[in-house]
């Protein structure tokens, strides 16, 4: 699988991503259900061993310390989210359960790159008056949306964040930078890892000076 194909899978609901992936391999005798069953079996064995990416723990704990409202909006199903995160309680407990997953149908009907999941996280979890998808935002809604900062690694997530009217910091795998992209949405800033994150650039309290 090339990174062009992987980029088209990242951030999307699993069945949508699976259909996209398999469409590139028409000669393989594999349907979506069989593929997902085997993929999920292998992934479920690996998720509890996944390590945090550089800078994540420092940033999340910093935001929590300063009472900055934070939430997670993920394209993963809730069962997968739990598998991915339960071995890192020192980080994910900071979100206090404020998590929207792709199968939370009371909030999300469309996956990324649609803006629904980010607007739902802001509206339902952080209680921000950001309006709803597909409705023209009022001036107040637009202003409130612009105060949000989305941190994403997926191209579809970056698009969703911008379509939600929010600022977007893109932290992609280096290989994604070589993928052809013709979309209208562009991240406000791109960095290699969250170790490069400077809170003050986004109106946030600076990191404490290290002893």
Model-assigned labels for residue ranges:
Residues 10-14, 35-39, 77, 91:
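Hydrophobic/aromatic residues within well-ordered alpha-helical segments
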Residues 61, 78-211:
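Asp-based, Mg2+/Mn2+-dependent phosphohydrolase catalytic module
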Residues 67-68, 166:
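Short phosphate-binding/catalytic loops that engage adenosine nucleotides
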Residues 13-28, 84-85, 121-125:
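Helix-loop "lid/cap" segments that line or gate small-molecule binding pockets
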Residues 22-61, 66, 130-142:
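Metal-dependent phosphoesterase signature
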Residues 9-13, 51-55, 76, 113, ...:
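Short beta->alpha linker loops
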Residues 14-18, 36, 56, 81, ...:
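A general structural signal for well-ordered alpha-helical segments in protein cores
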Residues 1-8, 19-25:
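Conserved phosphoryl-transfer catalytic core
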């Amino acid at each position: 699988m090339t990174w062009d194909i992987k980029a088209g899978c990242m951030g999307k609901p699993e069945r949508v991503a699976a259909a996209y992936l398999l469409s590139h391999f028409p000669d393989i005798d594999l349907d979506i259900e069989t593929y997902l069953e085997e993929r999920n079996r292998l992934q479920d064995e690996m998720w509890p061993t996944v390590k945090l990416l550089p800078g994540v723990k420092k940033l999340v704990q910093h935001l929590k310390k300063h009472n900055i409202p934070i939430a997670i909006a993920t394209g993963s199903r809730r069962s997968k989210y739990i598998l991915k995160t339960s071995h890192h309680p020192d980080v994910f407990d900071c979100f206090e359960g404020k998590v929207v997953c792709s199968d939370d149908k009371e909030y999300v009907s469309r996956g990324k790159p649609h803006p629904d999941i980010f607007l739902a996280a802001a509206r339902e979890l952080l209680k921000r008056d950001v309006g709803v998808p597909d409705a023209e935002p009022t001036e107040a809604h637009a202003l409130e949306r612009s105060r949000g900062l989305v941190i994403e690694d997926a191209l579809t997530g970056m698009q969703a964040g911008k379509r939600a009217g929010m600022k977007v910091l893109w932290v992609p795998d280096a290989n994604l930078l070589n993928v052809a992209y013709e979309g209208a949405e562009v991240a406000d800033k791109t960095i290699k890892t969250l170790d490069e994150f400077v809170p003050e650039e986004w109106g946030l309290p600076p990191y404490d000076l290290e002893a």
